[in-house]
Amino acid sequence: MGTVKITSRYGILLGFIALLCTIISAGIYFLTKDKIDAVIAAQQRELLLQVIPQDYFNNNLLESAVIPQDKNFVGIQKIYFAKKDGNISAYAYETTAPDGYSGDIRLLVGLDPKGEVLGVRVIEHHETPGLGDKIERRISNWILGFTNQSINEHNLSEWAVKKDGGKFDQFSGATITPRAVVNQTKRSALIMLNNQALLQQLSTQVK
């Protein structure tokens, strides 16, 4: 009987400790949530500014995102609409290259409505360190090669790595990774150019 009472007391004590830990954890979360959200928002803004220069827009890019549902936007997860005085001035596409050497490569691609690439950055990848990871800005300048490059019906063949007859450098010992990034940037630009009317419709959902 005494053993049962002791066990019950320990059970109650452990339950109380677990409840107390939960309350403390929840309190810490709510106290720090705003700070964490602010840090994440600042990081997102900084990344967006790397693909759409500030002088292109005066709206809030973080509040201008739309998740496209139309089949014409396959491979595009999110579109940010940059607007200057209410008019569309540029887009930032969150998109995924499915054919990296080690799987998906998530990209952020900035474009103006006429087909000029304003910037490209890698959001996430799993490419080989020392080879494919040169797509990262912190490791090499390769990704800057897209900035101010235009795409149109007359230069589509140029949008490939040099090994495939295009104008973009590949990496020594790692052609698959840069090829995937070039091809997905090209796809994103063509989706933008070929769906202007749909983009105008989507833009009405944001300020």
From Swiss-Prot:
The keyword Cell inner membrane applies. Belongs to the RnfG family. Its cofactor is FMN. It comes from Haemophilus influenzae (strain PittEE). It is found in: Cell inner membrane. Part of a membrane-bound complex that couples electron transfer with translocation of ions across the membrane. It holds the Pfam family FMN_bind. The complex is composed of six subunits: RnfA, RnfB, RnfC, RnfD, RnfE and RnfG. One of its GO terms (molecular function) is electron transfer activity. Signal peptide: none annotated. It is a single-pass membrane protein. One of its GO terms (biological process) is electron transport chain. Keywords: Cell inner membrane, Cell membrane, Electron transport, Flavoprotein, FMN, Membrane, Phosphoprotein, Translocase, Transmembrane, Transmembrane helix, Transport. InterPro entries: FMN-bd, Ion_transpt_RnfG/RsxG. NCBIfam families: PRK01908.1, rnfG. This is Ion-translocating oxidoreductase complex subunit G.
